A protein has these predicted regions:
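Metal-dependent phosphodiesterase/phospholipase catalytic core, i.e.
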Residues: 20, 27-125, 152
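Conserved, mostly hydrophobic/aromatic
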Residues: 3, 14, 66, 80, ...
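C-terminal active-site rim and adjoining tail of enzyme catalytic domains
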Residues: 54-60, 120-213
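Short, well-ordered coil/turn segments that N-cap beta-strands
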Residues: 7-9, 72-78, 95-99, 115-117, ...
């Protein structure tokens, strides 16, 4: 809610499964346990997950809560991370027109393409493609890729090819290196990329940044 009020309209959620197979928003179970002071068996059940609060204050989100939030905010788009099953998640999400799934294998990207799901190809499978990368993306109607900002300098040719093909590059690893914060990326790297995974809003940025929830 706070990031929405600041102006963010694209929100990233890490999606993982509870022990009883329910999709929930959490980065990983060890980190979640630290943030919630949970001391039970990992992964927890869905019921155990929903009982916990992050830092004792913030509620946890399952698919019901995620769908309720996006129903309440019809101009918001969800970008998923971690989950690599486009069919299962898209069937669970409220509005596939407002869903972009970062996917981590060629097979998952092709499956998403076959079912009309908006895919964002992750860096590792993209860089592993030996043939024409932009052609693969075009053939599979992939309009987004997620890359580390750390490879921009060494992959300028690829960045330009993606830009020329109309493929939007979102970068992560913002705030990982000294001085390389949102403003640095916005001021110095937006010529080669389209958006970034951001922790904070910059007043003169346009709406091309995904807030990390």
């Amino acid at each position: 809610d706070e990031n929405y009020k600041k102006g963010f309209r694209i929100f990233e959620l890490d999606i993982i499964e509870t022990s009883d197979g329910k999709l929930v928003a959490a980065h990983d179970w060890n980190m979640w346990a630290r943030f919630t002071d949970y001391t039970g068996t990992l992964p927890p059940t869905h019921a155990q997950f929903m009982k916990q609060k992050i830092y004792g204050d913030y509620i946890t989100m399952d698919m019901e809560a995620i769908n309720a939030w996006f129903k309440k905010h019809p101009d918001a788009t969800l970008v998923t991370d971690k989950v690599n099953d486009p069919i299962a998640f898209s069937e669970a999400f409220i509005d596939n027109d407002r869903l972009i799934m970062e996917l981590f294998s060629v097979m998952a990207v092709e499956k998403a393409s076959e079912h009309g799901i908006h895919a964002m190809m992750s860096q590792e499978p993209l860089m592993a493609i030996k043939d024409d990368k932009t052609n693969f993306l075009k053939v599979n109607n992939v309009k987004y890729v997620a890359l580390s900002r750390r490879i921009i300098a060494s992959q300028k040719k690829l960045m330009l090819q993606l830009k020329e093909a109309g493929i939007k590059v979102y970068v992560y690893n913002v705030n990982f290196d000294p001085g390389k914060d949102e403003k640095y990326v916005h001021d110095n790297e937006f010529g080669l990329i389209y958006g970034m995974y951001a922790d904070k809003w910059i007043s003169d940025m346009n709406f091309t940044s995904a807030s990390k929830l």
